Curated annotation (Swiss-Prot):
One of its GO terms (cellular component) is proton-transporting ATP synthase complex. One of its GO terms (biological process) is proton motive force-driven plasma membrane ATP synthesis. It comes from Methylobacterium nodulans (strain LMG 21967 / CNCM I-2342 / ORS 2060). The keyword Ion transport applies. This is ATP synthase gamma chain. Produces ATP from ADP in the presence of a proton gradient across the membrane. The gamma chain is believed to be important in regulating ATPase activity and the flow of protons through the CF(0) complex. Pfam families: ATP-synt (PF00231). Coiled coil: none annotated. InterPro entries: ATP_synth_F1_ATPase_gsu, ATP_synth_F1_gsu, ATP_synth_F1_gsu_CS. F-type ATPases have 2 components, CF(1) - the catalytic core - and CF(0) - the membrane proton channel. CF(1) has five subunits: alpha(3), beta(3), gamma(1), delta(1), epsilon(1). CF(0) has three main subunits: a, b and c. Keywords: ATP synthesis, Cell inner membrane, Cell membrane, CF(1), Hydrogen ion transport, Ion transport, Membrane, Transport. The keyword Iron-sulfur does not apply. Belongs to the ATPase gamma chain family.
């Protein structure tokens, strides 16, 4: 049985931990609102950009050369996985769920005889994936010092991908991130970004609006596709940021409540132990008095 001193130390330790988890929960809640607004504001822009590109691709002049970012290399040998996770932990299953989706995808590709390369955006994804795919990880992009994600962060990732694509380092690139739905619901998502997966414009959209393009559609597509890549990456980073704070807020709330339950149980054990010791001392005193 633990001594009273051990029990007091244990209770004090849990109380200190509870203060930390409560503080982290409050910080995550404060960051969540800003991150959620940024993610929700980015969605319509990214969706509209994809719609514009779909319209352009549908109306591409017959015989015109399709940009490589849309047509691809024509091969399916080398796959690049861009895995976006957090720089820190203590956010539940947020990091592990994204890494698991990427890991399963990589395993399928390897089983099919494809070559897999991985770029990790965020330290936690790198820590998880390097256990199995150390040789496949070609780069780690850390965002530890970034206080607020912006267009320049997405542009840096885009430039990296475009340089590798032009150098012929991969054929297909897939982006992995967590789509934010609510504080308790984040959905790990895989999105092919090179070549771009663009839905063609619907027949009604083509009928309702007839556009004349200057310059031609192919030139506009070639100019917009790199920007669309940046927009999709920025959206993924913002969705990830909101998902991370939501997961951390939920995890720290659960940890705080669990700490409270543990404090109650340990306090009960402490009181029972103390009561047993007092009772034992009284019995010893009474027994000694009777012996006299």
């Amino acid at each position: 049985m633990a001594s009273l001193k051990d029990l007091r130390n244990r209770i004090a330790s849990v109380k200190a931990t509870q203060k930390i988890t409560k503080a982290m929960q409050m910080v995550a809640a404060a960051k969540l609102r800003r991150a959620q607004n940024a993610a929700e504001n980015a969605r319509p822009y990214a969706e509209r950009m994809a719609a514009v590109l779909g319209n352009l691709a549908t109306n591409l002049t017959p015989g015109a050369e399709t940009p490589r970012l849309l047509a691809g290399t024509g091969a399916d040998r080398v796959h690049l996985l861009v895995v976006c996770t957090a720089e820190r932990g203590l956010c539940g299953a947020f990091n592990s769920s994204i890494a698991r989706l990427a890991r399963d995808h990589a395993r399928r590709l390897v089983a099919e005889g494809k070559t897999v390369k991985i770029i990790c955006v965020g330290k936690k994804g790198y820590d998880i994936l390097r256990r199995e795919f150390r040789d496949q990880i070609v780069e780690l992009i850390e965002l530890r010092g970034v206080r607020q994600l912006g267009f320049e962060n997405a542009e840096a990732v885009t430039e990296n991908l475009l340089n590798r694509f032009e150098a012929g380092e991969f054929d297909i690139a897939t982006l992995f991130y967590s789509r934010f739905r609510s504080v308790i619901a984040q959905v790990p998502t895989a999105q092919q970004i090179i070549p771009a997966e663009i839905s063609p414009a619907s027949e009604s959209a083509q009928t309702d609006a007839a556009y004349e393009y200057e310059p031609e559609e192919g030139e506009i597509l070639a100019a917009l596709l790199p920007k669309n890549l940046t927009v999709q990456i920025l959206r993924a980073l913002l969705e990830n940021a909101a998902s991370e704070q939501g997961a951390r807020m939920s995890a720290m709330d659960s940890a705080t409540r669990n700490a409270g339950e543990m404090i109650k149980k340990q306090t009960l054990v402490y009181n029972r132990t103390r009561q047993a010791m007092i009772t034992k001392e009284l019995i010893e005193i009474i027994s000694g008095a009777e012996a006299l």
